[in-house]
């Protein structure tokens, strides 16, 4: 609501560009919430299904949040103050890669939280997972940090010209 009140033009352009990934992110969040509620009311036989629904909803929300970020970094075509792109302009290799990178980020965050809160076998499993995910995340950060200025001359210019450097 704050974005709409402060910057209505930016709000309309951004929302128009990312309707589909934002709606899919919302569906993931809804699925996650419903799964969380129904898991505790389900029979033992059905709990595994609700666990999978929770995982799927969480992964979808995270992935489409990353896809939206990647699409935003790629840029939004605007003409005369209106969104000038198509319904799937947000869907490209960079945005999908960014979505996967955010999945790795949140997985690392979750595994480190479990390291703090658990002990025993789960703690050991999460330590191993966190080490692996840290390396995966570093690869995503490195790739995105290289990809961004190589794909966008304007960003490369801001990053690598004087007085911005140093």
What residue ranges belong to the model's regions?
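Flexible, glycine/proline-enriched loop segments at strand-loop-helix junctions
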Residues: 47, 53-56, 86-91, 102
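Juxtamembrane interface elements at the cytosolic ends of transmembrane helices
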Residues: 30-43, 69-81, 100-122
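Short aromatic-rich membrane-water interface segments that cap or initiate transmembrane helices
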Residues: 16, 84-100, 161-162
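Early transmembrane hairpin module of multi-pass membrane proteins
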Residues: 2-8, 88-92, 101-102, 112, ...
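Alpha-helical transmembrane segments of multi-pass integral membrane proteins
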Residues: 56-71, 94-110, 131-145
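Inter-helical loop and helix-membrane interface segments of multi-pass membrane transporters/permeases
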Residues: 7-14, 73-91
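Membrane-interface helix-loop-helix modules in multi-pass inner-membrane proteins
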Residues: 2-58, 79, 154-163
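Predominantly late transmembrane helices and immediately cytosolic-facing juxtamembrane segments
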Residues: 40-45, 113-118, 125-152, 166
